Amino acid sequence: MKFSELWLREWVNPAIDSDALANQITMAGLEVDGVEPVAGSFHGVVVGEVVECAQHPNADKLRVTKVNVGGDRLLDIVCGAPNCRQGLRVAVATIGAVLPGDFKIKAAKLRGEPSEGMLCSFSELGISDDHSGIIELPADAPIGTDIREYLKLDDNTIEISVTPNRADCLGIIGVARDVAVLNQLPLVEPEIVPVGATIDDTLPITVEAPEACPRYLGRVVKGINVKAPTPLWMKEKLRRCGIRSIDAVVDVTNYVLLELGQPMHAFDKDRIEGGIVVRMAKEGETLVLLDGTEAKLNADTLVIADHNKALAMGGIFGGEHSGVNDETQNVLLECAFFSPLSITGRARRHGLHTDASHRYERGVDPALQHKAMERATRLLIDICGGEAGPVIDITNEATLPKRATITLRRSKLDRLIGHHIADEQVTDILRRLGCEVTEGKDEWQAVAPSWRFDMEIEEDLVEEVARVYGYNNIPDEPVQASLIMGTHREADLSLKRVKTLLNDKGYQEVITYSFVDPKVQQMIHPGVEALLLPSPISVEMSAMRLSLWTGLLATVVYNQNRQQNRVRIFESGLRFVPDTQAPLGIRQDLMLAGVICGNRYEEHWNLAKETVDFYDLKGDLESVLDLTGKLNEVEFRAEANPALHPGQSAAIYLKGERIGFVGVVHPELERKLDLNGRTLVFELEWNKLADRVVPQAREISRFPANRRDIAVVVAENVPAADILSECKKVGVNQVVGVNLFDVYRGKGVAEGYKSLAISLILQDTSRTLEEEEIAATVAKCVEALKERFQASLRD
C-alpha cells in the first residue's frame, strides 16, 4: 500500500522526521518498502495567472502570453501547451528557476518572441508522467505563492507491505492508529457530519445471501454533475497513493477506500430495474464487466443484481450495464460488508485482483459502513452537487463477525515476552489499541476492536503488547532454563535402530502421503471404512490411510515405470482407523511397513538371477523381530488377508496377539495396481514391539552339546512353527536348540502329509548328559508331538 506522509500527518503528527517515522512503522510490523519524494527537486516555480494569450506570429503551435506572478510587471512567456488560455492559473518557472535534471530557466527568444520563463506541466516538475498540457490550478490559487508550498510538494510517498492479518492498515486510518498508539498521541479523525436526507427517493434492497453479505447499505443521490472536475487536492492525494484520477464519482469512492479502507461502488440508478438483490450467481450466468470483458459466473460467486440481471460481482468488480457514465445524473451508492470467505478466490478465478477484493478477502471493519457512506455522500455532494436520500441499511446481526473477548494472564505475558511490563502500562497499551479492557487479579479481559480480525487468542494480545511496548525496549537477558534429563529405559527399542538395520539390508526409507486414493485403498482393504477428508487436495488424495501399503505400493509402481525393477523400501508412520472408542473417533497407530520386489541380488556375473520370495522377506522381518529379543515368542500363522496371496502369506502373532502381516501381494491386486512381477509386503504395529526383552547374562555350559535328529510325519495343515514350539516347551530344561532342516513330501509319505526333519540340541550347564537322559528327552518330545498333532516317526 502507498500513501502520502502528509496525509498521514493530518491524522497524527508525531514530532519525528520522515526517516524515523518510516523506521517506526517498520518496527510496528508494517514493513516500509520505500520512501520517495512526491515531486522532483526544483525551486523558483510560483503560481501565476495568464492575463493575455495570443497566437505566436511565427509558429502555429505556440502562443505568446503575458503572465502575472505577483511582481511589478507582467512576464512575456511563450508556451506551446494546447490548454493554455486567458484567465488560467498556472505553475510558472521564473528566470533563475532550476527544474528537475538541473534544467535552468533563462531569458530567451522563441521564433523571435521573448520568453521570460516557462509554464510548467506535471512531468516537467517531476510530479507525474502527465505531459499533455500545463498544470491547471484552481481559480483561487494565490498568485506569487511558491508552487511547492501551494501543492504541498515537500511530501513523501511511503510504500508498506501489509501482511494478510493487518487488513485494517489498508487505509490511512489503520496506519494512523498504529502511529498514534506508538507515539501516545490522539488520533485526529476528519469530522464526518451525517448528511441529512433532502429527498425521499430509495430503491428496494433484498439480501438473499446473508452469510456472504451480513450488511448492505444503499443510498440514492439525485441530480449530480458527473462532469464536475475533481478538486486538485483530491487528485494529488490519490496520485500520491498510486491511484489515477478518472472522474469525480469514482475519485470519491477511491478516496474513501484509501482513507477509511472501505470499498464502495456507485451504480447508475436509472439503469437499475426494480431494485437491488444481493444473491449468489446462477450457474453459468454472465456479466459484462466495466473493462468490457465478459465473465461466466459460478454458483458460489456473490453478485449484486437488479430484478432482471446481475449488475456487479459483489466486492470484486462492477458491471458495464450499471456503471456511471457521462450521462449519469442519479446514482446509488453502495457500501457493504462482505464475508471474506465469500470473496476469497473468486477474483483470481476470473484473472482479477482489485483494490476492493484485496480488502474484502482480508476483512473490512464491519462497523465502518455508516461512517464511509456519510463521508462519501458529503464529498460527492460538495463536488458534484445533488440531493441525498435516506440510507437503507439491511443488516443480519447473526452473521456479522463478533468481537473476540480474550483473557490475558500476567504469567503468560511475562513468560512469552521474558520481561515484566507494569500493569498500568499493559492496560494503557490495550486501551490505546482500541480494546475494551477490564482489569482483574493478574489478568486482563479485553474485547478486541471491530477492525482487528487478527485479535482472537491470548498470544495475539501478548504480541500487541510487545509490539507497542517496543521490541528494542525489551532488554537482552540470558536464557535461564533447567535441563531435565530424558529418561531412558534399557528395554526401549529405538525405531532408528530398526531403520538402520533395514538400511543395512538394502532397504531405502520413503515417506508417503497420509491421504490416499480411496478407490485404491478399497482394493487393498475391501469393506473397511476410512476417514474421508471434507476438503481434499484432490479426489486421489481424499481418504486417510488405513495402512502404509497404499502409499508403498504406489511408490513401487512409480519406480517400476521408471525402469527400477529391483525395489526395497520401507516406511514408518501413522495409520488412521475409525474407532468409536478412540478420542475424536479415530485411532492413530504407528506402523512399520516394507515392500520388496525384483531380483534377490543386484546384477552380478557370479550370482544367478533369482526373484525374491516369501522367505526373503520373512528372513528380513525375523532380523527386525530379533532386535526385540522376542523372536522365540513370535508365531507366523496362516491367516487370510484380502490384499495377500492366500498360500504365501501369514499373520504375525506375539504372545497370542496379532501384530502384523507378511506375504506376497494377491495376484488380482497386482494386476489392478499394474505391479510388475511378484511383490511382497509386511506391516507391523510398532508400539507392540518397542518394548524389547533385555538380554540376561547366563552361564555358558562347559559341557558338550548333543544333537539328535528326528523325522516326524504330520498332516499338511500342521504349521512347522507349532511343532518346533512344542519341542521347546517339552524339553525346556535340556533342549537348548530346535531347528527344522528338511521338509519332505513324496514316496513313503502319504498324500496330505509331510515329513519334517528336526534337529534337537541338548545340553546341561552342570554336567555331561548321559545317553539314557538324552534318549528320554527325545522320546518325551516325540510322545508330545504324537499326542498333540498325531505325529508319527518316519521309518
Swiss-Prot record:
Tetramer of two alpha and two beta subunits. Keywords: Aminoacyl-tRNA synthetase, ATP-binding, Cytoplasm, Ligase, Magnesium, Metal-binding, Nucleotide-binding, Protein biosynthesis, RNA-binding, tRNA-binding. Residues 701-794 form the FDX-ACB domain. It catalyses: tRNA(Phe) + L-phenylalanine + ATP = L-phenylalanyl-tRNA(Phe) + AMP + diphosphate + H(+). The gene is pheT. GO terms for molecular function: ATP binding; magnesium ion binding; phenylalanine-tRNA ligase activity; tRNA binding. PROSITE patterns: B5, FDX_ACB, TRBD. Its cofactor is Mg(2+). This is Phenylalanine--tRNA ligase beta subunit. Belongs to the phenylalanyl-tRNA synthetase beta subunit family. Type 1 subfamily. Its EC number is 6.1.1.20. Gene3D superfamilies: 3.30.56.10, Bira Bifunctional Protein, Domain 2, Ferrodoxin-fold anticodon-binding domain, Nucleic acid-binding proteins, Phenylalanyl-trna Synthetase, Chain B, domain 3. It comes from Shigella sonnei (strain Ss046). Binds 2 magnesium ions per tetramer. GO terms for cellular component: phenylalanine-tRNA ligase complex. Residues 401-476 form the B5 domain. Mg(2+) binds at residues 454, 460, 463-464. It is found in: Cytoplasm.
